[in-house]
Amino acid sequence: MKHPPCSVVAAATAILAVVLAIGGCSTEGDAGKASDTAATASNGDAAMLLKQATDAMRKVTGMHVRLAVTGDVPNLRVTKLEGDISNTPQTVATGSATLLVGNKSEDAKFVYVDGHLYSDLGQPGTYTDFGNGASIYNVSVLLDPNKGLANLLANLKDASVAGSQQADGVATTKITGNSSADDIATLAGSRLTSEDVKTVPTTVWIASDGSSHLVQIQIAPTKDTSVTLTMSDWGKQVTATKPV
């Protein structure tokens, strides 16, 4: 069996680490269209909203995710990703991603099923089994109530309501704060900051329709960089079969 080049393996690993770690985002165009309003709630309201969002996120077992990256984020090869993930009864994910393989940008499709990551990276239309995903990255971390998005919401520091916005077409309350760099590293599968950085500026957009769903989260690991994840279709059940 011919093994894929190391650069392709590394990029495929990046798919796995990001698709279910940070995954999904609205574009900058969406952010540009969002109209800020004066903050209508106190910082106490921010804590309450984050608590409600945390509780809601802990109950999510599947969703659609979109990821977008601005700037050169350390240790992050994926620049764009869109896919679906669910963790009940087992972790399954499908989607597509754009990655840096060496100095070249490549598009790839991926399927994660039965504990294996399959991708056509480097061979469009022909899938390669990149092995047991659990040995590369714990793909269930995104929806893990103790390590994933729920954990970030529960531990967002210096939280403050920054107004109301439309995020991905959903009415939301925008909250700014800071996340632990270690928590971000756990979620991303690799450290996105230097070792001496302790916190990462984080902004979240929480649905104001009563569901308290986390619609969007954006982190700024380093100067002039950002990673934005947008969620939808909460509760979605994802199915997939091993690619032929």
Swiss-Prot record:
Q: Which GO terms describe its molecular function?
A: lipid binding; receptor ligand activity
Lipidated positions (S-diacylglycerol cysteine) are: C25
In its record, the post-translational modification comment is: Modified by Lgt on Cys-25 with an S-linked diacylglycerol, signal peptide is removed by LspA, Cys-25 is further modifed with an amide group on the amino group by Lnt yielding a triacylated protein. Upon expression in M.smegmatis non-glycosylated form and glycosylated forms are detected (by concanavalin A binding); when only the mature sequence is expressed from mutated protein only the non-glycosylated form is detected.
Record keywords: Membrane included?
yes
Q: Which Gene3D superfamilies match?
A: 2.50.20.20
Indicate the segments annotated as coiled coil, or none if absent: none
- What are the disulphide bonds in this sequence? none
Question: PROSITE patterns recorded for this chain?
Answer: PROKAR_LIPOPROTEIN
The protein's UniProt keywords, in alphabetical order, are: Cell membrane, Glycoprotein, Lipid-binding, Lipoprotein, Membrane, Palmitate, Signal
What topology in the membrane does the UniProt record assign?
Answer: Lipid-anchor
Function according to Swiss-Prot or TrEMBL: Constitutes a host TLR2 agonist (toll-like receptor), shown experimentally for human and mouse. In host cells full-length (acylated) protein acts as a TLR2 agonist, inducing human and murine macrophages to produce cytokines, inducing murine dendritic cell maturation and cytokine production and inhibiting antibody processing in murine macrophages. Binds diacylated phosphatidyl-myo-inositol mannosides (PIMs). Does not induce murine macrophage apoptosis or necrosis. Non-acylated protein does not act as a TLR2 agonist.
Name of this protein: Lipoprotein LprA
Instruction: Give the classification, highest ranks.
Output: Bacteria, Bacillati, Actinomycetota, Actinomycetes, Mycobacteriales
